[in-house]
Amino acid sequence: MINESIAKLVKYGENAGLVSGLDKIYATNRILEVMQISDYEEPEQIPETPDLEETLNELLDDAAKRGLLEHNSVVYRDLFDTKIMGLLMPRPSEVIRHFHELYEQVSPEAATDYYYKLSRDSDYIRRYRICKDMKWVAPTKYGDLDITINLSKPEKDPKAIAAAKLAKQSGYPKCQLCMENVGYAGRTNHPARNNPQDHTSHHQ
């Protein structure tokens, strides 16, 4: 089961253009390392278009069962799956270079489209949560008011809040938008940036 989940994630990476065929074994081995698995056998058959949310949940459930998560809660699951997705990501310099190539040689729109697609494909933008956001329009005497309840950033659970209070205070990264966030693993009181979509904004 876990072998199939790993193979599905690598296949997803290939389909999304995050992993080339030449890097398939390398990506598999990096995932095995994070999952602390030493034995692996390539499944005979996997879906052609694996579902990312389902695949990540399979990996997270397995990691939780084997004690790789401090707590099986949304905060720790998010930290861990961000680490996993970071294994499929190109280096920051590659993202920046390709963005600027598209910007200068094609168009600013092409560069922005590339970056937005990368943000979605890498799970930095969690599509399966955003679609659950609640939106409606409320009429007021000043005009229509657009109201949104953002469910793509769920509230921290009590255990994570307690852990954040007990966590040693750190001045690194200096802030949540500072350059030092690129590739940062995160902690209970600071978000992970392993799937580093802040590359171009930090670089410019």
Question: What are these language model-derived features?
Answer:
Residues 1-203:
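Active-site microenvironments that recognize anionic phosphate/pyrophosphate groups
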